[in-house]
Amino acid sequence: MQKRAIYPGTFDPITNGHLDIVTRATQMFDHVILAIAASPGKNPMFTLDERVALAQKATAHLSNVEVAGFSDLMANFARDRQANILIRGLRAVADFEYEMQLAHMNRHLMPQLESVFLMPSKEWSFISSSLVKEVARHQGDVTHFLPDNVHQALMNKLK
């Protein structure tokens, strides 16, 4: 039986920290779905289609990764995709409380849905999409934190 996992997030935009998590997940699971949430309430900089395209290009070298957008409940998306594992990244203790709430709610909605928490590599432990966008808005160099295609897209958005 194939182990299918979902790594959900807004990915606005996808960072090297996200790529670190998804790359490591590909070594643990047969198939990883990078699930990009529409998240209209977060007022994303990039459209859902743009975020999907950026992530597809950034993960093209990972043969067992599929990128898909979604706007439904995560538990419903997981059920539809026949995945029973959620991958979540934990950067700091502060992330844990919120992630624990999400894990319990998802498990309530889909009892067989397990959450697996991965810590990013030390190099990426402090970055977030929001922080990268904020630094870039103030002309800070964020090249190191983003895949090349994403960096170019971000610079174009900020022009």
Swiss-Prot record:
Query: Which keywords does this Swiss-Prot/TrEMBL entry list?
Result: ATP-binding, Coenzyme A biosynthesis, Cytoplasm, Magnesium, Nucleotide-binding, Nucleotidyltransferase, Transferase
* Binding positions for substrate per the UniProt entry: T10, K42, M74, R88
Q: Which Gene3D superfamilies match?
A: HUPs
Q: Which residues does the record give as ATP binding sites?
A: T10, F11, H18, G89, L90, R91, E99, W124, S125, F126, I127, S128, S129, S130
CDD domains in alphabetical order: PPAT
Please give the cofactor(s) recorded in the UniProt entry for this protein.
Answer: Mg(2+)
Entry's localization field:
Cytoplasm
Q: Under what name is this protein listed?
A: Phosphopantetheine adenylyltransferase
Species, as recorded: Salmonella arizonae (strain ATCC BAA-731 / CDC346-86 / RSK2980)
